[in-house]
Amino acid sequence: MCEQKYRWTKKQIRQQLAVVRGEMAPTLVLKNATYLNSVRGKWLDANIWIYQDRIVYVGQDMPAKLDDETEVVDCGQQVIVPGYIEHHAHPFQLYNPHSFANYAAAMGTTTLINDNLMFFLALEKKKALSMIESLDELPSSMYWWCRYDPQTEMNDEEGHFLNSKIKEWLEHPLVVQGGELTSWPKVITGDDGILHWMQETRRLRKPIEGHFPGASEKTLTQMSLLGVTSDHEAMTGEEVIRRLDLGYMTSLRHSSIRSDLAKILREMKELGIDDFSRCMLTTDGSPPSFYEQGIMDRLIKIALDEGIPPKDAYGMATYYVARYYGLDYELGMIAPGRIAHLNFLDNVFNPVPTSVLAKGQWVVRDGQRYGSDSVFPWEDFGMKRLTIDWDLSVDELHFSMPMGIELVNSVILKPYQVSVEASRDTLAEDHDECFFLLLDKHGKWKIPTMIKGFAKKVSGLASSFSTTGDIILIGKCIQDMIVAFNALKQQGGGIVLVENGEVISNIPLEIMGLLSSKPMEEVMEEEKKFVKALRERGYEHDDPIYSLLFFSSTHLPYIRVTQRGIYDVHKKTVLFPSIMR
Protein backbone atom coordinates (compact mmCIF):
# COMPACT_ATOMS: atom_id res chain seq x y z
CA MET A 1 0.00 0.00 0.00
CA CYS A 2 1.09 3.57 -0.55
CA GLU A 3 2.32 5.40 2.53
CA GLN A 4 0.27 8.54 2.89
CA LYS A 5 -0.60 9.92 6.30
CA TYR A 6 -0.53 6.52 8.02
CA ARG A 7 1.12 3.28 6.93
CA TRP A 8 -1.60 1.14 8.55
CA THR A 9 -5.28 2.00 8.97
CA LYS A 10 -7.07 1.70 12.31
CA LYS A 11 -8.81 -1.43 11.04
CA GLN A 12 -5.50 -3.05 10.08
CA ILE A 13 -3.97 -2.24 13.45
CA ARG A 14 -6.99 -3.77 15.23
CA GLN A 15 -6.52 -6.92 13.15
CA GLN A 16 -2.85 -7.06 14.12
CA LEU A 17 -3.79 -6.80 17.80
CA ALA A 18 -6.32 -9.59 17.33
CA VAL A 19 -3.55 -11.84 15.99
CA VAL A 20 -1.44 -11.25 19.11
CA ARG A 21 -4.46 -12.01 21.34
CA GLY A 22 -5.17 -15.25 19.50
CA GLU A 23 -8.45 -14.06 18.01
CA MET A 24 -7.13 -14.12 14.42
CA ALA A 25 -4.51 -16.22 12.70
CA PRO A 26 -1.27 -14.74 11.39
CA THR A 27 -0.53 -15.07 7.68
CA LEU A 28 3.02 -16.37 8.24
CA VAL A 29 4.83 -17.95 11.20
CA LEU A 30 8.61 -18.40 11.26
CA LYS A 31 9.28 -20.94 14.00
CA ASN A 32 12.60 -21.91 15.56
CA ALA A 33 14.19 -18.79 14.08
CA THR A 34 17.67 -17.59 15.01
CA TYR A 35 17.59 -13.88 14.31
CA LEU A 36 19.70 -10.77 14.79
CA ASN A 37 18.36 -8.67 17.63
CA SER A 38 19.69 -5.36 16.36
CA VAL A 39 19.18 -3.40 19.57
CA ARG A 40 21.17 -5.84 21.71
CA GLY A 41 23.53 -6.91 18.94
CA LYS A 42 22.85 -10.55 19.79
CA TRP A 43 21.67 -13.64 17.93
CA LEU A 44 18.51 -14.86 19.66
CA ASP A 45 16.03 -17.70 19.16
CA ALA A 46 12.35 -16.93 18.72
CA ASN A 47 9.15 -17.55 16.83
CA ILE A 48 8.21 -14.66 14.54
CA TRP A 49 4.58 -13.99 13.64
CA ILE A 50 3.71 -11.91 10.59
CA TYR A 51 0.31 -10.58 9.60
CA GLN A 52 0.23 -9.41 6.00
CA ASP A 53 3.11 -6.90 5.75
CA ARG A 54 3.89 -6.39 9.45
CA ILE A 55 5.76 -8.27 12.16
CA VAL A 56 3.28 -8.59 15.03
CA TYR A 57 5.15 -10.81 17.51
CA VAL A 58 8.70 -11.95 18.26
CA GLY A 59 9.10 -14.30 21.21
CA GLN A 60 8.88 -17.84 22.52
CA ASP A 61 5.16 -18.47 21.96
CA MET A 62 3.41 -20.00 18.98
CA PRO A 63 0.09 -18.49 17.84
CA ALA A 64 -3.01 -19.70 19.65
CA LYS A 65 -4.85 -19.71 16.36
CA LEU A 66 -3.76 -21.00 12.96
CA ASP A 67 -5.95 -21.52 9.92
CA ASP A 68 -5.68 -22.87 6.38
CA GLU A 69 -4.28 -19.53 5.18
CA THR A 70 -1.40 -19.52 7.68
CA GLU A 71 1.99 -20.53 6.33
CA VAL A 72 4.32 -22.04 8.94
CA VAL A 73 8.03 -22.22 8.09
CA ASP A 74 10.60 -24.04 10.22
CA CYS A 75 13.74 -21.88 10.18
CA GLY A 76 15.88 -24.15 12.32
CA GLN A 77 18.68 -24.41 9.75
CA GLN A 78 18.90 -20.68 8.94
CA VAL A 79 19.60 -17.29 10.47
CA ILE A 80 17.38 -14.28 9.80
CA VAL A 81 18.45 -10.64 9.52
CA PRO A 82 16.50 -7.48 8.69
CA GLY A 83 16.10 -6.56 5.03
CA TYR A 84 19.01 -4.45 3.83
CA ILE A 85 18.76 -0.70 3.20
CA GLU A 86 20.56 1.21 0.43
CA HIS A 87 20.32 4.77 1.71
CA HIS A 88 22.06 6.50 -1.19
CA ALA A 89 20.54 5.19 -4.43
CA HIS A 90 20.62 7.06 -7.73
CA PRO A 91 17.92 4.93 -9.42
CA PHE A 92 18.47 6.26 -12.92
CA GLN A 93 21.82 4.87 -14.06
CA LEU A 94 20.28 3.48 -17.27
CA TYR A 95 17.91 1.35 -15.15
CA ASN A 96 14.76 2.79 -13.58
CA PRO A 97 13.55 2.82 -9.93
CA HIS A 98 11.08 -0.01 -10.53
CA SER A 99 13.52 -2.39 -12.22
CA PHE A 100 16.25 -1.58 -9.71
CA ALA A 101 13.94 -2.16 -6.73
CA ASN A 102 12.83 -5.55 -8.09
CA TYR A 103 16.42 -6.61 -8.71
CA ALA A 104 17.66 -5.28 -5.37
CA ALA A 105 14.91 -6.99 -3.39
CA ALA A 106 15.89 -10.36 -4.85
CA MET A 107 19.35 -9.80 -3.35
CA GLY A 108 17.98 -8.81 0.04
CA THR A 109 18.04 -5.01 -0.35
CA THR A 110 14.38 -4.36 0.37
CA THR A 111 14.52 -0.63 1.14
CA LEU A 112 15.87 2.10 -1.14
CA ILE A 113 16.31 5.76 -0.21
CA ASN A 114 16.46 7.42 -3.61
CA ASP A 115 17.77 10.55 -5.28
CA ASN A 116 14.84 12.53 -6.71
CA LEU A 117 16.87 14.79 -9.04
CA MET A 118 15.98 13.32 -12.42
CA PHE A 119 12.26 13.22 -11.67
CA PHE A 120 12.33 16.62 -9.97
CA LEU A 121 13.71 18.15 -13.18
CA ALA A 122 11.78 16.09 -15.74
CA LEU A 123 8.26 15.99 -14.27
CA GLU A 124 5.83 18.52 -12.94
CA LYS A 125 5.37 18.29 -9.18
CA LYS A 126 1.99 16.54 -9.00
CA LYS A 127 2.99 13.77 -11.41
CA ALA A 128 6.34 13.24 -9.69
CA LEU A 129 4.80 12.89 -6.23
CA SER A 130 2.09 10.58 -7.58
CA MET A 131 4.83 8.48 -9.16
CA ILE A 132 6.76 8.00 -5.91
CA GLU A 133 3.53 7.02 -4.17
CA SER A 134 2.82 4.40 -6.82
CA LEU A 135 6.37 3.04 -6.57
CA ASP A 136 5.84 2.53 -2.83
CA GLU A 137 3.21 -0.08 -3.68
CA LEU A 138 6.05 -2.45 -4.62
CA PRO A 139 7.14 -5.12 -2.13
CA SER A 140 10.19 -2.91 -1.52
CA SER A 141 10.01 0.21 0.63
CA MET A 142 10.84 3.26 -1.48
CA TYR A 143 11.86 6.52 0.16
CA TRP A 144 13.26 9.68 -1.43
CA TRP A 145 15.50 12.70 -1.01
CA CYS A 146 14.65 16.29 -1.85
CA ARG A 147 17.35 18.05 -3.85
CA TYR A 148 18.07 21.74 -3.33
CA ASP A 149 20.07 22.26 -6.53
CA PRO A 150 20.50 20.66 -9.98
CA GLN A 151 24.28 20.01 -9.61
CA THR A 152 24.78 21.87 -12.89
CA GLU A 153 24.24 25.34 -14.38
CA MET A 154 20.79 25.48 -15.99
CA ASN A 155 19.16 28.17 -18.11
CA ASP A 156 15.92 27.91 -16.12
CA GLU A 157 17.07 26.80 -12.66
CA GLU A 158 14.72 29.23 -10.90
CA GLY A 159 11.77 27.75 -12.79
CA HIS A 160 12.53 24.30 -11.40
CA PHE A 161 13.64 25.11 -7.85
CA LEU A 162 10.62 27.00 -6.58
CA ASN A 163 9.87 27.48 -2.88
CA SER A 164 6.43 25.92 -3.23
CA LYS A 165 7.80 22.90 -5.09
CA ILE A 166 10.64 22.28 -2.61
CA LYS A 167 8.26 22.69 0.33
CA GLU A 168 5.79 20.13 -0.99
CA TRP A 169 8.56 17.61 -1.66
CA LEU A 170 10.05 18.11 1.81
CA GLU A 171 6.69 17.67 3.51
CA HIS A 172 5.85 14.43 1.70
CA PRO A 173 5.98 11.41 4.06
CA LEU A 174 8.05 9.38 1.60
CA VAL A 175 10.74 12.07 1.50
CA VAL A 176 13.11 11.42 4.40
CA GLN A 177 16.06 13.77 3.82
CA GLY A 178 17.27 16.91 2.14
CA GLY A 179 20.18 16.76 -0.29
CA GLU A 180 22.54 15.57 -1.33
CA LEU A 181 23.76 19.15 -1.13
CA THR A 182 26.14 19.64 -4.05
CA SER A 183 25.99 23.45 -4.15
CA TRP A 184 27.40 23.84 -0.64
CA PRO A 185 29.96 26.50 -1.75
CA LYS A 186 27.01 28.76 -2.65
CA VAL A 187 25.47 28.25 0.78
CA ILE A 188 28.72 29.01 2.60
CA THR A 189 29.20 32.19 0.58
CA GLY A 190 25.72 33.58 1.10
CA ASP A 191 22.92 31.73 -0.74
CA ASP A 192 20.07 32.24 1.73
CA GLY A 193 17.53 30.61 -0.58
CA ILE A 194 19.09 27.17 -0.19
CA LEU A 195 19.77 27.86 3.50
CA HIS A 196 16.05 28.53 3.97
CA TRP A 197 15.22 25.12 2.46
CA MET A 198 17.80 23.53 4.74
CA GLN A 199 16.19 25.19 7.75
CA GLU A 200 12.80 23.92 6.61
CA THR A 201 14.24 20.40 6.37
CA ARG A 202 15.56 20.55 9.93
CA ARG A 203 12.27 22.06 11.15
CA LEU A 204 10.58 18.96 9.77
CA ARG A 205 13.14 16.88 11.75
CA LYS A 206 14.58 15.38 8.58
CA PRO A 207 18.36 14.99 8.10
CA ILE A 208 20.47 16.63 5.39
CA GLU A 209 23.14 14.84 3.37
CA GLY A 210 26.18 16.69 2.09
CA HIS A 211 28.59 16.12 -0.77
CA PHE A 212 32.01 17.13 0.53
CA PRO A 213 34.90 15.39 -1.26
CA GLY A 214 38.24 16.39 0.24
CA ALA A 215 36.60 18.87 2.64
CA SER A 216 38.71 20.38 5.41
CA GLU A 217 37.82 20.41 9.08
CA LYS A 218 36.76 24.06 8.80
CA THR A 219 34.49 23.39 5.82
CA LEU A 220 32.88 20.38 7.50
CA THR A 221 32.41 22.43 10.67
CA GLN A 222 30.67 25.23 8.79
CA MET A 223 28.41 22.78 6.97
CA SER A 224 27.43 21.20 10.28
CA LEU A 225 26.49 24.65 11.59
CA LEU A 226 24.38 25.12 8.45
CA GLY A 227 22.45 21.94 9.28
CA VAL A 228 24.13 19.11 7.36
CA THR A 229 24.09 15.83 9.30
CA SER A 230 25.80 13.27 7.03
CA ASP A 231 28.26 12.86 4.18
CA HIS A 232 29.22 10.03 1.82
CA GLU A 233 32.47 11.38 0.34
CA ALA A 234 35.06 10.05 2.83
CA MET A 235 37.76 8.30 0.78
CA THR A 236 40.19 7.31 3.54
CA GLY A 237 40.01 6.15 7.13
CA GLU A 238 41.32 9.54 8.22
CA GLU A 239 38.51 11.33 6.36
CA VAL A 240 35.97 9.02 8.02
CA ILE A 241 37.32 9.92 11.46
CA ARG A 242 37.27 13.64 10.61
CA ARG A 243 33.55 13.37 9.89
CA LEU A 244 32.76 11.18 12.89
CA ASP A 245 34.61 13.54 15.23
CA LEU A 246 32.49 16.43 13.96
CA GLY A 247 29.26 14.53 14.62
CA TYR A 248 28.46 13.42 11.08
CA MET A 249 26.74 10.19 10.20
CA THR A 250 29.33 8.87 7.76
CA SER A 251 28.74 6.67 4.73
CA LEU A 252 31.36 4.13 3.66
CA ARG A 253 31.22 3.81 -0.10
CA HIS A 254 31.97 1.00 -2.52
CA SER A 255 31.01 1.96 -6.07
CA SER A 256 32.03 1.58 -9.68
CA ILE A 257 34.38 4.57 -9.46
CA ARG A 258 35.36 4.26 -5.76
CA SER A 259 35.65 0.53 -5.05
CA ASP A 260 37.79 0.87 -1.94
CA LEU A 261 35.57 -0.11 1.00
CA ALA A 262 38.00 -2.79 2.19
CA LYS A 263 40.86 -0.26 2.29
CA ILE A 264 38.77 2.29 4.19
CA LEU A 265 37.72 -0.30 6.78
CA ARG A 266 41.33 -1.43 7.28
CA GLU A 267 42.45 2.16 7.77
CA MET A 268 39.63 2.80 10.23
CA LYS A 269 40.65 -0.20 12.31
CA GLU A 270 44.32 0.83 12.19
CA LEU A 271 43.28 4.26 13.49
CA GLY A 272 41.46 2.67 16.43
CA ILE A 273 37.83 2.82 15.31
CA ASP A 274 35.87 0.03 16.98
CA ASP A 275 32.40 1.60 17.06
CA PHE A 276 30.64 1.58 13.67
CA SER A 277 27.20 2.68 14.86
CA ARG A 278 27.57 6.08 13.16
CA CYS A 279 28.50 4.54 9.82
CA MET A 280 26.40 3.36 6.87
CA LEU A 281 27.25 1.42 3.72
CA THR A 282 26.40 2.57 0.19
CA THR A 283 27.06 1.71 -3.46
CA ASP A 284 26.37 5.35 -4.46
CA GLY A 285 24.17 4.61 -7.47
CA SER A 286 26.49 2.59 -9.68
CA PRO A 287 25.76 1.48 -13.28
CA PRO A 288 23.94 -1.83 -13.91
CA SER A 289 26.84 -4.25 -14.38
CA PHE A 290 28.38 -3.24 -11.04
CA TYR A 291 25.42 -4.92 -9.35
CA GLU A 292 25.94 -8.35 -10.90
CA GLN A 293 27.87 -9.31 -7.78
CA GLY A 294 25.25 -7.99 -5.38
CA ILE A 295 24.12 -4.79 -3.75
CA MET A 296 24.20 -4.30 0.02
CA ASP A 297 24.88 -8.02 0.49
CA ARG A 298 28.16 -7.49 -1.36
CA LEU A 299 29.20 -4.61 0.90
CA ILE A 300 28.25 -6.49 4.06
CA LYS A 301 30.42 -9.40 2.87
CA ILE A 302 33.37 -7.04 2.36
CA ALA A 303 32.90 -5.75 5.91
CA LEU A 304 32.70 -9.28 7.34
CA ASP A 305 35.81 -10.31 5.40
CA GLU A 306 37.65 -7.33 6.93
CA GLY A 307 36.85 -8.58 10.42
CA ILE A 308 34.03 -6.16 11.23
CA PRO A 309 31.78 -7.77 13.89
CA PRO A 310 28.59 -9.17 12.32
CA LYS A 311 26.31 -6.91 14.39
CA ASP A 312 28.09 -3.89 12.87
CA ALA A 313 28.48 -5.28 9.34
CA TYR A 314 24.73 -5.91 9.18
CA GLY A 315 23.90 -2.84 11.27
CA MET A 316 25.57 -0.49 8.76
CA ALA A 317 23.02 -1.67 6.17
CA THR A 318 20.00 -2.06 8.47
CA TYR A 319 19.49 -0.77 12.01
CA TYR A 320 22.05 2.05 12.03
CA VAL A 321 20.57 3.40 8.80
CA ALA A 322 16.96 3.19 9.96
CA ARG A 323 17.80 4.79 13.30
CA TYR A 324 19.59 7.71 11.64
CA TYR A 325 16.62 8.43 9.35
CA GLY A 326 14.13 8.09 12.20
CA LEU A 327 12.63 5.02 10.52
CA ASP A 328 13.60 2.40 13.11
CA TYR A 329 10.01 2.30 14.32
CA GLU A 330 9.17 0.44 11.09
CA LEU A 331 12.46 -0.63 9.45
CA GLY A 332 15.90 -1.99 10.23
CA MET A 333 15.14 -4.50 12.95
CA ILE A 334 13.19 -7.67 13.61
CA ALA A 335 10.68 -6.61 16.24
CA PRO A 336 6.92 -6.11 16.60
CA GLY A 337 5.53 -3.23 14.58
CA ARG A 338 8.17 -3.33 11.87
CA ILE A 339 7.54 -3.95 8.18
CA ALA A 340 8.21 -7.60 7.38
CA HIS A 341 11.45 -7.19 5.43
CA LEU A 342 13.48 -10.30 6.29
CA ASN A 343 16.51 -12.05 4.79
CA PHE A 344 17.12 -15.75 5.36
CA LEU A 345 20.80 -16.74 5.38
CA ASP A 346 22.62 -20.07 5.41
CA ASN A 347 25.06 -18.66 7.95
CA VAL A 348 26.05 -15.39 9.60
CA PHE A 349 29.11 -14.88 7.39
CA ASN A 350 27.27 -15.25 4.08
CA PRO A 351 24.93 -12.25 3.69
CA VAL A 352 23.58 -13.43 0.33
CA PRO A 353 20.02 -14.52 1.18
CA THR A 354 18.52 -17.80 0.04
CA SER A 355 15.03 -16.45 0.74
CA VAL A 356 13.71 -12.90 1.02
CA LEU A 357 10.51 -11.50 2.48
CA ALA A 358 9.53 -7.97 1.44
CA LYS A 359 6.43 -6.50 3.07
CA GLY A 360 5.53 -10.04 4.07
CA GLN A 361 5.68 -11.36 0.49
CA TRP A 362 8.16 -13.94 -0.74
CA VAL A 363 10.25 -12.27 -3.43
CA VAL A 364 12.76 -15.13 -3.22
CA ARG A 365 11.98 -18.56 -1.78
CA ASP A 366 14.79 -21.13 -1.64
CA GLY A 367 16.55 -19.38 -4.51
CA GLN A 368 13.43 -19.04 -6.69
CA ARG A 369 12.39 -15.46 -7.60
CA TYR A 370 8.75 -14.36 -7.54
CA GLY A 371 6.90 -11.34 -8.89
CA SER A 372 9.85 -9.84 -10.78
CA ASP A 373 7.93 -9.52 -14.06
CA SER A 374 5.64 -6.68 -12.99
CA VAL A 375 5.41 -3.63 -15.27
CA PHE A 376 5.24 -0.01 -14.14
CA PRO A 377 3.03 2.49 -16.08
CA TRP A 378 5.61 5.22 -16.69
CA GLU A 379 3.50 7.00 -19.30
CA ASP A 380 0.76 7.61 -16.73
CA PHE A 381 3.16 10.01 -15.04
CA GLY A 382 4.30 11.82 -18.16
CA MET A 383 7.46 9.77 -18.66
CA LYS A 384 7.19 9.09 -22.38
CA ARG A 385 9.49 8.23 -25.25
CA LEU A 386 11.90 11.02 -26.17
CA THR A 387 10.84 12.87 -29.30
CA ILE A 388 13.47 14.90 -31.17
CA ASP A 389 11.55 16.89 -33.78
CA TRP A 390 14.47 18.85 -35.22
CA ASP A 391 17.38 18.06 -37.52
CA LEU A 392 21.13 18.49 -37.31
CA SER A 393 23.32 19.10 -40.36
CA VAL A 394 27.04 18.76 -41.03
CA ASP A 395 27.24 22.51 -41.65
CA GLU A 396 26.45 23.18 -37.97
CA LEU A 397 29.38 21.19 -36.63
CA HIS A 398 32.22 23.71 -36.44
CA PHE A 399 34.89 23.28 -33.76
CA SER A 400 37.06 26.39 -33.59
CA MET A 401 37.26 26.91 -29.83
CA PRO A 402 40.91 27.20 -28.65
CA MET A 403 40.20 25.55 -25.31
CA GLY A 404 38.85 22.04 -24.89
CA ILE A 405 37.98 19.72 -22.02
CA GLU A 406 40.24 16.89 -20.85
CA LEU A 407 38.78 13.82 -19.16
CA VAL A 408 41.48 12.89 -16.63
CA ASN A 409 39.48 10.07 -15.01
CA SER A 410 35.89 8.84 -15.23
CA VAL A 411 34.41 12.10 -13.93
CA ILE A 412 37.03 14.86 -13.61
CA LEU A 413 37.38 17.43 -16.42
CA LYS A 414 40.24 19.90 -16.82
CA PRO A 415 40.74 22.62 -19.45
CA TYR A 416 43.39 22.05 -22.10
CA GLN A 417 44.78 23.89 -25.10
CA VAL A 418 43.54 22.27 -28.32
CA SER A 419 46.58 20.98 -30.22
CA VAL A 420 45.05 19.53 -33.39
CA GLU A 421 43.59 21.12 -36.49
CA ALA A 422 39.87 21.03 -35.68
CA SER A 423 38.56 22.46 -38.95
CA ARG A 424 38.66 19.06 -40.64
CA ASP A 425 35.73 16.67 -40.99
CA THR A 426 37.76 13.74 -39.66
CA LEU A 427 40.47 13.53 -36.98
CA ALA A 428 43.37 11.07 -36.96
CA GLU A 429 43.30 8.07 -34.61
CA ASP A 430 46.89 8.47 -33.37
CA HIS A 431 45.79 10.86 -30.60
CA ASP A 432 42.96 11.01 -28.06
CA GLU A 433 41.33 14.30 -29.06
CA CYS A 434 37.74 14.16 -30.37
CA PHE A 435 35.02 16.55 -31.39
CA PHE A 436 32.53 17.25 -28.58
CA LEU A 437 29.10 18.84 -28.88
CA LEU A 438 26.41 19.43 -26.25
CA LEU A 439 23.01 20.10 -27.84
CA ASP A 440 19.83 21.38 -26.24
CA LYS A 441 17.29 18.55 -26.29
CA HIS A 442 14.82 21.01 -27.83
CA GLY A 443 17.32 22.11 -30.48
CA LYS A 444 17.70 25.73 -29.34
CA TRP A 445 21.43 25.97 -28.55
CA LYS A 446 24.74 24.15 -28.90
CA ILE A 447 28.20 24.11 -27.29
CA PRO A 448 30.95 22.85 -29.64
CA THR A 449 34.40 22.12 -28.23
CA MET A 450 37.06 19.39 -28.21
CA ILE A 451 37.56 16.59 -25.70
CA LYS A 452 40.86 14.92 -24.85
CA GLY A 453 41.22 11.66 -22.93
CA PHE A 454 37.88 10.09 -23.87
CA ALA A 455 39.00 7.69 -26.63
CA LYS A 456 41.24 7.43 -29.69
CA LYS A 457 38.98 5.59 -32.11
CA VAL A 458 35.38 6.59 -31.39
CA SER A 459 34.02 7.64 -34.76
CA GLY A 460 30.56 8.80 -33.69
CA LEU A 461 28.73 8.62 -30.36
CA ALA A 462 25.38 10.17 -29.43
CA SER A 463 23.78 10.12 -25.99
CA SER A 464 20.62 11.58 -24.47
CA PHE A 465 21.76 10.10 -21.15
CA SER A 466 23.07 13.16 -19.29
CA THR A 467 22.39 15.15 -16.14
CA THR A 468 19.77 17.35 -17.83
CA GLY A 469 18.70 15.08 -20.69
CA ASP A 470 20.47 17.25 -23.25
CA ILE A 471 22.29 15.50 -26.10
CA ILE A 472 26.00 14.72 -26.19
CA LEU A 473 27.87 14.03 -29.43
CA ILE A 474 31.49 12.79 -29.40
CA GLY A 475 33.63 11.48 -32.22
CA LYS A 476 36.48 11.61 -34.69
CA CYS A 477 34.22 11.78 -37.76
CA ILE A 478 31.60 14.50 -38.14
CA GLN A 479 29.59 12.42 -40.61
CA ASP A 480 29.40 9.48 -38.17
CA MET A 481 28.39 11.87 -35.38
CA ILE A 482 25.45 12.95 -37.56
CA VAL A 483 24.57 9.30 -38.25
CA ALA A 484 24.68 8.61 -34.50
CA PHE A 485 22.41 11.59 -33.83
CA ASN A 486 19.88 10.41 -36.40
CA ALA A 487 19.96 6.86 -35.00
CA LEU A 488 19.36 8.33 -31.54
CA LYS A 489 16.32 10.20 -32.88
CA GLN A 490 14.96 7.06 -34.46
CA GLN A 491 15.27 4.87 -31.37
CA GLY A 492 13.75 7.51 -29.08
CA GLY A 493 16.82 8.28 -27.01
CA GLY A 494 19.60 6.40 -25.28
CA ILE A 495 23.20 5.87 -26.34
CA VAL A 496 24.40 5.04 -29.87
CA LEU A 497 27.90 4.19 -31.15
CA VAL A 498 28.51 4.46 -34.91
CA GLU A 499 31.43 3.46 -37.13
CA ASN A 500 31.68 3.78 -40.92
CA GLY A 501 28.06 4.86 -41.10
CA GLU A 502 26.74 1.81 -39.19
CA VAL A 503 25.44 1.43 -35.63
CA ILE A 504 27.83 -0.96 -33.87
CA SER A 505 26.43 -0.70 -30.33
CA ASN A 506 23.49 0.95 -28.65
CA ILE A 507 21.51 1.17 -25.42
CA PRO A 508 17.87 2.17 -26.02
CA LEU A 509 16.46 4.29 -23.18
CA GLU A 510 12.74 4.26 -23.87
CA ILE A 511 11.72 6.39 -20.88
CA MET A 512 12.42 10.07 -21.72
CA GLY A 513 15.71 9.08 -23.36
CA LEU A 514 17.12 8.62 -19.85
CA LEU A 515 15.93 5.27 -18.48
CA SER A 516 15.53 1.76 -19.83
CA SER A 517 12.17 0.04 -19.42
CA LYS A 518 13.85 -3.38 -19.44
CA PRO A 519 14.71 -5.60 -16.46
CA MET A 520 18.10 -5.03 -14.82
CA GLU A 521 19.61 -8.18 -16.26
CA GLU A 522 18.91 -7.08 -19.84
CA VAL A 523 20.23 -3.58 -19.23
CA MET A 524 23.40 -5.10 -17.76
CA GLU A 525 24.04 -7.01 -20.97
CA GLU A 526 23.44 -3.93 -23.13
CA GLU A 527 25.76 -1.88 -20.94
CA LYS A 528 28.53 -4.50 -21.01
CA LYS A 529 28.41 -4.74 -24.81
CA PHE A 530 28.53 -0.95 -25.14
CA VAL A 531 31.40 -0.57 -22.66
CA LYS A 532 33.33 -3.37 -24.39
CA ALA A 533 32.93 -1.62 -27.76
CA LEU A 534 34.00 1.68 -26.24
CA ARG A 535 37.07 0.17 -24.57
CA GLU A 536 38.09 -1.43 -27.85
CA ARG A 537 38.12 2.10 -29.26
CA GLY A 538 40.33 3.54 -26.56
CA TYR A 539 38.21 4.47 -23.53
CA GLU A 540 40.55 3.75 -20.59
CA HIS A 541 38.79 5.06 -17.48
CA ASP A 542 36.69 3.13 -14.95
CA ASP A 543 33.14 4.02 -15.94
CA PRO A 544 31.92 5.56 -19.23
CA ILE A 545 28.31 5.70 -18.00
CA TYR A 546 29.33 8.07 -15.22
CA SER A 547 31.46 10.03 -17.69
CA LEU A 548 28.39 10.72 -19.86
CA LEU A 549 26.20 11.55 -16.87
CA PHE A 550 28.67 13.97 -15.29
CA PHE A 551 29.92 16.10 -18.22
CA SER A 552 27.57 18.85 -16.99
CA SER A 553 27.83 18.24 -13.24
CA THR A 554 29.25 21.25 -11.43
CA HIS A 555 29.68 19.47 -8.09
CA LEU A 556 32.93 18.08 -9.56
CA PRO A 557 36.10 19.95 -10.61
CA TYR A 558 37.37 21.68 -12.68
CA ILE A 559 35.29 22.68 -15.68
CA ARG A 560 31.93 21.44 -17.01
CA VAL A 561 29.90 21.75 -20.19
CA THR A 562 26.53 23.08 -19.02
CA GLN A 563 23.41 24.57 -20.59
CA ARG A 564 24.89 28.02 -20.02
CA GLY A 565 28.21 27.14 -21.62
CA ILE A 566 31.64 25.88 -20.59
CA TYR A 567 31.75 26.61 -16.87
CA ASP A 568 34.68 27.14 -14.48
CA VAL A 569 33.58 25.39 -11.27
CA HIS A 570 36.13 27.09 -8.99
CA LYS A 571 35.57 30.63 -10.30
CA LYS A 572 31.81 30.06 -10.80
CA THR A 573 31.93 31.74 -14.20
CA VAL A 574 30.99 30.85 -17.77
CA LEU A 575 34.15 30.74 -19.87
CA PHE A 576 32.48 30.23 -23.25
CA PRO A 577 28.69 30.71 -23.51
CA SER A 578 26.36 28.41 -25.39
CA ILE A 579 25.58 29.37 -29.00
CA MET A 580 22.04 29.79 -30.29
CA ARG A 581 21.32 27.58 -33.32
Curated annotation (Swiss-Prot):
Listed Gene3D superfamilies: Metal-dependent hydrolases, Urease, subunit C, domain 1
UniProt KW keywords: Hydrolase
GO biological process: adenine catabolic process
Sequence similarity: Belongs to the metallo-dependent hydrolases superfamily. Adenine deaminase family.
Species: Halalkalibacterium halodurans (strain ATCC BAA-125 / DSM 18197 / FERM 7344 / JCM 9153 / C-125) (Bacillus halodurans)
Protein's recorded name: Putative adenine deaminase BH0637
GO molecular function (one): adenine deaminase activity
Enzyme class: hydrolase
Reactions performed catalytically: adenine + H2O + H(+) = hypoxanthine + NH4(+)
Keyword Hydrolase among UniProt keywords: yes
UniProt key word Disulfide bond: no
Highest taxon above the source species: Bacteria
